[in-house]
A protein has these predicted regions:
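Amphipathic alpha-helical hairpins
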Residues: 1-94
Length: 94
């Protein structure tokens, strides 16, 4: 029984990590799209934004199914990736 509880907690925490990451990506995509030089890349960012919105909605559905509020917890991995992306935008903007 204790193992089931631990797995449930791990699942919930992982959902929170993913939810946080997807929400942060949604915030970052407009900045990345604005920094894109080619129309094709801008379009790709818009498409990715649409897909990410679907991911967020699906995650919110999963939270409802398990009876938990849709809430993220800070994910250091996505923070690092987004920081790297900001650096790339600065480098290419020069």
């Amino acid at each position: 029984m204790a193992t089931e509880k631990k797995l449930e907690e791990l699942f919930h925490h992982t959902l929170q990590d993913i939810y946080y990451a997807e929400k942060q990506i949604l915030k970052a995509i407009p900045k990345m799209a604005a920094g894109a030089k080619s129309p094709e890349l801008k379009k790709a960012f818009e498409h990715h934004k649409d897909q990410t919105e679907v991911h967020v909605t699906r995650l919110e559905d999963v939270f409802k199914m398990i009876g938990q509020p849709a809430k993220g917890v800070k994910c250091d991995a996505i923070e690092g990736i987004l920081k790297e992306g900001e650096g790339a935008l600065e480098d290419f903007g020069k």
